[in-house]
Amino acid sequence: MKARQVLVFLLSVGAALAALWLVFPADGIAAGGITLRFASRDGYLRDASAVKVDVDSVLTGVASRFEMEADTLEHYRRFFHDNPDRIYLPDDDDHYFDAVFQQMEKASEEGRTVRVLHYGDSQIEMDRISQDLREALQERFGGSGTGLFPALGNVPSGSISRSASGALEHYTMYGDSTTQRAGHNRYGPLAQVVQLSGEATVNLRPTTNKNAREGAKEFSRISVLYGRPSPDFSLKVTSDTLKAKVTTETSPSGVTLSVWQFSRPVRRASVRLNGSAEIYAIGADGPFGVTVDNIPLRGCSGTIFTRISKPLMEESLSLEDVRLIILQFGGNYMPVARSTKVIEQYQEQIARQISYFQEVAPEAKILFIGPSDMGKSVNGRIVTWPRLPEVVDSLKATALRSGAAYWDLYRMMGGENSMGQWVKHVPPYAGPDHIHFTPAGARKVGEAFSQ
């Protein structure tokens, strides 16, 4: 075939495709139970006319709206009533968090620690978002360390290096069919339990993760929360040649918190266990102040807590002096949120979880963080998941009606179709799955939340 003929052929094909592009419906053509799709002029114009979120402008706006008159009490009152990026308070109660902050201030003065539990799905794995809140609170109220974590687990921590060996078995309340479930409901505050059946050692040292905050790497207080010990159970924490002051407190039903307080921060520590016991959590903290516990529950929609032993959870949270509980869920529910009725059922489940925490931690306040924007391919375009705005609004209404505060992450990002712009940002603030934040994006979210 001559070059001229090839050129004519290519031009003819191009002309035919251009003509098809001009007339093809944007929503495709239904034929025999299937839909034929092709790039179209209407679809192109629709994309071109769509409002695109400027991520940098959104984040700058969040910061500037908070900074204006931030040194006045009147500003804070207006912020919680009028600022679109605010934390929404139940009954518009300006004093909702007063008791929390009072306890945080007293903690440093009295040489004790108070805890903030941050539960979430995989969006907060590797200490994402939690570490920014931790850093902000510890700068203001004092404290250091990374908080609570399981003795053994399949999700690494972003702020501490942990290695375990010996007779330990890990069970979780959440996860798919590949995760092990215990034959009871005594899972503790991390929604997981590690069964000790013999000798075991858990070694701890500061993480080498480049994204970890320096304050999280510094700890001088090692604690172990456990229950149902055998008569021959023994527990010891060692760190180089340093000696520690050891205290132990046991609840009426036998949940025990043992604490090793060293005279200065340690570079490494070993927790040595022997016998039989249920290990609910290990903590690595500073001697006083605030600690924020990152508790990622991969694949969870936040509806599992009511299945955990209420007496065990109540006594655990009391021993750990928990004053704020953050629940960050909703994203994992989107694949099944196909109707308003299903969403209403989810509302009821979330309301029960909030009520559960209000019962087991009456001294704590509860804050619910809704899902981020999430992108899904529809007709070749990445758009917000169908019904996500409805889920966001329903969760907000449920939290406030149940007496919990609410922070709207979806709106903070820029609302509908904003996730695509977070993905396209340089550097990327979200991954190619259009669901999870990158470390840089998670930091922006954490900073916005911590304002």
Predicted regions and their residues:
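Conserved SGNH/GDSL esterase-like catalytic core that processes O-acyl groups on lipids
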Residues: 124-238, 247-348, 436
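Hydrophobic membrane-insertion alpha-helices, especially the h-region
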Residues: 7-25
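Catalytic His-Asp segment of secreted/periplasmic serine-dependent ester chemistry enzymes
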Residues: 310, 372-451
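Short hydrophobic beta-strand that contains or immediately precedes a catalytic carboxylate
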Residues: 116-120
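Alpha-helical scaffolding within the catalytic cores
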Residues: 92-105, 305-319, 348-356, 389-390, ...
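Active-site segments of SGNH/GDSL-like serine hydrolases
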Residues: 36, 328-334, 356-392, 408
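Juxtamembrane proline-rich low-complexity "stalk" or linker regions positioned immediately after a signal peptide
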Residues: 27-75
